[in-house]
C-alpha cells in the first residue's frame, strides 16, 4: 500500500499530465484562466497539498475527466 505522500505525488503527476495533454503548458495560465489560486494549483501538482474532493472534482471537471477515470489507473 502506498503512503499518503506517494498518493499525493501521484495525484499531482496525473493532474500535470492531464493539464499538458489539454494544451496548457503552464500551470499558471491554467490556474489564472479558471479562477484557481496559482500557488494552490502549484501545490496540487507538486504533491504538496491534500486536495479536498471538491477541489479535485472542480479541476477534473474543467478538464472533462471524471473521478472514476482519474483514479482508474496508477492507484
What does each model-identified segment do?
Residues 1-22:
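A short, Lys/Arg-rich alpha-helix, primarily the initiator
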Residues 13, 24-26, 51-54:
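Residue-level signal for the short linker/turn that defines the boundary of a DNA-recognition helix
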Residues 16, 28, 57:
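Residues within the helices of the helix-turn-helix
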Residues 19, 31, 60:
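The alpha-helix within a helix-turn-helix
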Residues 23-43:
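Short alpha-helical DNA-recognition segment
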Residues 39-42, 49, 68:
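Key DNA-contact positions within bacterial/archaeal DNA-binding proteins
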Residues 52-69:
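DNA major-groove recognition helix of helix-turn-helix/homeodomain DNA-binding modules
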